[in-house]
């Protein structure tokens, strides 16, 4: 989109124009892998006032920990070895998100290098468009549904055009991400819209995320040794096989210049 010097921390937004495309699940998985495995100091801002998926995930996990001595003991051992607390998650309104983040950054002693924003399910309002332009990067998951793809591409083009035309806009790039792909289904829609994205100069991740019931496995279902979606643990490595998650995380780090050193 455009090349500007990225300031620290990097602001990374997750936005979609349709509910149920896996936006929050992907944000949760990315945050936990980057923080717990790759050592990236980060914080999460849940702006999705209607769902609050990220914030409510943490709340559910706290309840499970309170109710299960075994899980509590295993997590205690994990964090004792990890040497740090869980990353911060706070909820706020979209129009207050940036102010809240700045307050957090001035109050914390941790050198936060990445802030992940989970946007509401419909990112088309004025407040959300303004917030979009204040991100460094946006990840927008899409599914092979022509009706929802129209609005997703319209949002991507709006952010791109405003990001280029407004000199003070922070946004550097928005990337679409094919998500929940059925391996046995036809790729006609995916191929068509991938070509369309190229023709419109809209960036797509090379990696694709494949449909899997494993994304729904929280602490309550899988326990510490079988969890996929958690704010306290990264997805169990063996469960990621075939999902595209590992490849996607590596591409995120490369494209957004998130150093793991």
Model-derived segments and spans:
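Pre-Walker A adenine-sensing motif
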Residues: 1-5
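Inter-lobe coupling/hinge region of RecA-like P-loop helicase motors
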Residues: 215-249
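Conserved C-terminal guanine-recognition region of P-loop GTPase G domains, centered on the G4
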Residues: 152-168
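P-loop/Walker-type NTP enzyme "switch/lid" segment
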Residues: 7, 15-21, 35-115
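Beta-strand-loop-alpha "switch" segments that mediate conformational coupling across diverse proteins
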Residues: 180-229
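Inter-motif core of Ras-like GTPase G domains
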Residues: 126-146
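Gly/Ala-rich phosphate-binding loop of Rossmann-like dinucleotide-binding domains
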Residues: 31, 35-36, 132
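Hydrophobic positions on the alpha1 helix immediately C-terminal to the Walker A/P-loop
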Residues: 25-26, 30
């Amino acid at each position: 989109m455009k090349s500007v010097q990225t300031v620290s921390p990097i602001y990374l937004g997750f936005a979609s124009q349709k509910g149920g495309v896996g936006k929050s699940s992907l944000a949760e998985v990315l945050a936990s892998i980057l923080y717990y495995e790759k050592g990236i100091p980060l914080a999460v801002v849940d702006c999705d006032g209607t769902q609050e998926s990220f914030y409510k995930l943490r709340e559910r996990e706290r309840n499970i920990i309170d109710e299960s001595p075994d899980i509590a003991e295993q997590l205690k051992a994990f964090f004792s070895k990890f040497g740090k607390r869980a990353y911060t998650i706070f909820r706020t309104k979209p129009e207050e998100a940036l102010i809240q983040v700045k307050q957090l950054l001035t109050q914390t002693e941790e050198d936060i290098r990445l802030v992940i924003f989970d946007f509401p399910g419909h990112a088309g309002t004025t407040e959300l468009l303004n917030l979009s332009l204040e991100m460094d990067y946006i990840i927008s998951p899409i599914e092979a549904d022509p009706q929802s793809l129209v609005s997703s591409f319209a949002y991507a083009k709006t952010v791109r055009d405003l990001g280029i035309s407004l000199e003070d806009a922070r946004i550097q790039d928005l990337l679409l991400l094919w998500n929940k792909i059925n391996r046995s289904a036809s790729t006609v829609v995916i191929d068509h819209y991938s070509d369309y994205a190229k023709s419109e100069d809209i960036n797509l991740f090379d990696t694709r995320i494949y449909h899997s019931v494993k994304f729904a496995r929280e602490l309550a279902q899988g326990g510490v040794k079988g969890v996929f979606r958690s704010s306290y643990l990264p997805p169990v490595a063996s469960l990621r096989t075939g999902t595209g998650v590992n490849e996607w995380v590596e591409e995120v780090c490369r494209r957004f210049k998130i150093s793991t050193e």
